[in-house]
Amino acid sequence: MWRQAKWNEPLIFELNKSGAARQGFLINKDEEIRSQIKEMKIPKNLLRENEPDLPSLSELEVVRHFVRLSQMNFGVDIGIMPLGSCTMKYNPKIEEKATAITEFHHPLEDEDYIQGILEMIYELQNWFSEITGMDECSLQVPAGSAGEFAGVLMIKKYHEEHNRNYKDTILVADTAHGTNPASAAMAGYKVMYVKSNAEGLVDMDILREIVNDKTAGFMLTNPNTLGLFEENILEISKIIHSTNAVLYYDGANLNGVLGIARPGDMGFDIVHLNLHKTFAVPHGGGGPGAGAICAKGELVNYLPYPMVEKVNGKYKLSKIPKNSIGKIATFYGNVGNLARSFAYILGLGPQGIQMIGKMSTLATNYLIAKLRDVKELELIAPNRHRKHEVVFSVKQLMENYGVSANDVAKALLDNGFYAPTIYFPPIVEEALMIEPTETETKETLDMFAETLKKIVNDAKINPEQVMKSPNNTSIARLDQAYANHPSTITPTYRVLRLRRLGKIDYLK
């Protein structure tokens, strides 16, 4: 039986309760250096009034603290993480070496001394353009979501340049990721949802009905969030372009068609990529991520700058598209993560890239085949082929036994599996969204499927047991309201300290 470690581990600031002065290393007070720099004259306005509130700990204490925390955590190095629409694939460790060459990463480094880094970015621009079927690509954006926002800003400026300010609405699918309507709203657009039909695809009749002169663009994933390929994509492209609107590709689900189908060939005009999903940038912990925004035709003129170009054999960070929306962030993206993606693509090559799309699709459909006889795991359009992910509904378990999707997810935790995404997309009741990715073995998928079958059976025989899960994890069920309420949410040690001192009530 799987059991997670459970340590009564305090915060690192609370480890040294004795107040003893401890150090992980000693600073060498070199007299020769001191004699050369003399007295350091730091302006008073830059000096701290008090010493920094840092924990005084030995190296051993720090190592043990974080190792114990890691034992109470879960990651892809421990087991499968089937979080749907997150593509929690295993990232080869060799990519870490690529990003470890930190001396060439400083954003103010002279171009003459970072030709290798600029060449890498230049090649990535071309590779991502080829992979997506776009004409050009900018890597200036610091994350996938920032790339998405940049794409909507490009749509907005494109219409403004063509005196089409009356286009005030962005369409999004009802299975869309939440960042789609958020990006559109942040750019000042109204948002209108396009409903899915009974087969889980864009309802073409509804689309034809709502597209009009005010439509600025349509944000769509393909495959969609149900794991289904939008088979009418070429017709969708014609409908959107008939009103001079822009077809925007959310790259969140690219893994399922990588190397097999390209957004540009489907009729999309702008593509954003999540390098943390598809191209070996690690997930979790709040970042940093990395993004790419690609475009074709006239829309390349609106890409964020700067872009790398090759001039007389020298790589320069000097390309500024004619109608660029400008910079999305300071300096140039997250270069360390771009190095990870560069090493990943270079190691795989075109054939390896294509195998990602094939194997991720195979893994999903194999899992469906293993679970097809479990009638409590319902599918929209059950006979349709899936791509990168699948969404099951456990509505029957909820209606007949009171066991929810959340309960099933917690029971998976009890068996040493990370939980799938739940209650998304919202068009599926009691949804379990599972994305196995291409890196999981048949044996792992078999174990996952058998465990899910067992949980469904347990839910029918002893539902109370499932509803009490998890029992084998470091922490059981959190009080979500308490954890997120402004009067109790405590994201940092400083907030905790202020709460204890009674100096803060609501976190704004």
From Swiss-Prot:
Database matches in InterPro entries: GcvPB, GDC-P_C, GDC-P_N, GDC_P, PyrdxlP-dep_Trfase, PyrdxlP-dep_Trfase_major, PyrdxlP-dep_Trfase_small
Annotated GO CC locations: cytosol; glycine cleavage complex
Role of this protein: The glycine cleavage system catalyzes the degradation of glycine. The P protein binds the alpha-amino group of glycine through its pyridoxal phosphate cofactor; CO(2) is released and the remaining methylamine moiety is then transferred to the lipoamide cofactor of the H protein.
Reactions that this protein is recorded to catalyse: N(6)-[(R)-lipoyl]-L-lysyl-[glycine-cleavage complex H protein] + glycine + H(+) = N(6)-[(R)-S(8)-aminomethyldihydrolipoyl]-L-lysyl-[glycine-cleavage complex H protein] + CO2
Enzyme class: oxidoreductase
Family to which this protein belongs: Belongs to the GcvP family. C-terminal subunit subfamily.
Protein name: Probable glycine dehydrogenase (decarboxylating) subunit 2
GO BP field: glycine decarboxylation via glycine cleavage system
Signal peptide boundaries: none
CDD domains linked to this entry: GDC-P (cd00613)
Domain of life according to the entry: Archaea
Subunit structure: The glycine cleavage system is composed of four proteins: P, T, L and H. In this organism, the P 'protein' is a heterodimer of two subunits.
UniProt keyword list: Oxidoreductase, Pyridoxal phosphate
GO MF annotations, alphabetized: glycine binding; glycine dehydrogenase (decarboxylating) activity; pyridoxal phosphate binding
Protein species of origin: Saccharolobus solfataricus (strain ATCC 35092 / DSM 1617 / JCM 11322 / P2)
EC nos: 1.4.4.2
PANTHER family: GLYCINE DEHYDROGENASE (DECARBOXYLATING), MITOCHONDRIAL (PTHR11773:SF1), GLYCINE DEHYDROGENASE, DECARBOXYLATING (PTHR11773)
Modified residues (N6-(pyridoxal phosphate)lysine): 277
The protein's required cofactors: pyridoxal 5'-phosphate
